[in-house]
Amino acid sequence: MTNTRKTHPLXKIINHSFIDLPAPSNISAWWNFGSLLGLCLIIQILTGLFLAMHYTSDTMTAFSSVTHICRDVNYGWLIRYMHANGASMFFICLFLHVGRGMYYGSYTYFETWNIGVILLFAVMATAFMGYVLPWGQMSFXGATVITNLLSAIPYIGTTLVEWIWGGFSVDKATLTRFFAFHFILPFIIAALVMVHLLFLHETGSNNPSGIISDSDKIPFHPYYTIKDILGVLLLVLTLMALVLFSPDLLGDPDNYTPANPLSTPPHIKPEWYFLFAYAILRSIPNKLGGVLALVFSILILMLFPLLHLSKQRSMMFRPLSQCVFWILVADLFTLTWIGGQPVEHPFIIIGQLASILYFAIILLILPTVSMIENKLLKW
């Protein structure tokens, strides 16, 4: 008798992706973040759908519609805070997932890696537009500041900004289109995730040693399904602890004041997950230079496969590269801290040094250290 799981056209795709998928026998907990990101996306789409049922994308009523959700809708407060803090969990998982790829050399699957970088951009765009929707002070100021950056593009900049705004300032048209884009983008992200997995399953997963593991594969189910369930439990535990005990921990108090174009918050800053990029943007005194540095700070990830000069794929057996990698992580923490500080001494110079170090490590120090390690191993 034939097994439906292996013959049915739809069930077969699921089977080859999540059940009978050959997986390396030694992948660690760092490989859990793919499934956790999938879960985060599902949580965000579902909570977002229920929020959209009660939200109005009009400047006059947006803020009060969010208040209405929190006060009058059954479990509206829970849905709203799960959505807001779910975004934070999404980015934590994203950063760890990307960091894992950098450490273990997963970027050598460059189709998978490049789709991943595009996904990162898409998620960042979605999060930015979502932050504008409650129409609080920081929503308004953030939308104004970030969209204004496009005016740095020579010749077409000003026209482009006014086109995105749908007027001469951030107003009703801007809010409505941001809501439309914020709704559609997660579904585009879901489609890109499919492509990401398609490319990944062409090659199979990498593993901590970076050595080809074709000779030693195990089925994904039950080994990694049970392992993923543990990750899911920990993620849900963290998310619900955040939502139920301190839902506003990662938010900005300014966003509890309705948007007022006539008064600007003293310190405009984005959500914590954009602070590192915001610090890089602010550390360059020139507007266009800052915008380019901001874009390149993420786009630089696409250069990783080209900058890989080591004879070994993973950093597992490369202590010097490990050192440099963890300095890069510390540097990103420093940038995140600086992004949340006011623009004054000594934060300005710390931010500039941290920004220079960020690009130097990726473009110069890591490749150089890789070559030194090759020499030490007489390769």
Swiss-Prot record:
It is a multi-pass membrane protein. Heme b b566 binds at residues 97, 196. Keywords: Electron transport, Heme, Iron, Membrane, Metal-binding, Mitochondrion, Mitochondrion inner membrane, Respiratory chain, Transmembrane, Transmembrane helix, Transport, Ubiquinone. One of its GO terms (molecular function) is ubiquinol-cytochrome-c reductase activity. Pfam families: Cytochrom_B_C, Cytochrome_B. Heme b b562 binds at residues 83, 182. The keyword Mitochondrion applies. Its cofactor is heme b. One of its GO terms (biological process) is mitochondrial electron transport, ubiquinol to cytochrome c. Binds 2 heme b groups non-covalently. GO terms for cellular component: mitochondrial inner membrane; respiratory chain complex III. The chain crosses the membrane at residues 33-53, 77-98, 113-133, 178-198, 226-246, 288-308, 320-340, 347-367. A ubiquinone binds at residue 201. Its main location: mitochondrion. It is found in: Mitochondrion inner membrane. The cytochrome bc1 complex contains 11 subunits: 3 respiratory subunits (MT-CYB, CYC1 and UQCRFS1), 2 core proteins (UQCRC1 and UQCRC2) and 6 low-molecular weight proteins (UQCRH/QCR6, UQCRB/QCR7, UQCRQ/QCR8, UQCR10/QCR9, UQCR11/QCR10 and a cleavage product of UQCRFS1). This cytochrome bc1 complex then forms a dimer. Belongs to the cytochrome b family. Component of the ubiquinol-cytochrome c reductase complex (complex III or cytochrome b-c1 complex) that is part of the mitochondrial respiratory chain. The b-c1 complex mediates electron transfer from ubiquinol to cytochrome c. Contributes to the generation of a proton gradient across the mitochondrial membrane that is then used for ATP synthesis. Heme 1 (or BL or b562) is low-potential and absorbs at about 562 nm, and heme 2 (or BH or b566) is high-potential and absorbs at about 566 nm. This is Cytochrome b. It comes from Spermophilus erythrogenys. The lineage of its organism: Eukaryota, Metazoa, Chordata, Craniata, Vertebrata.
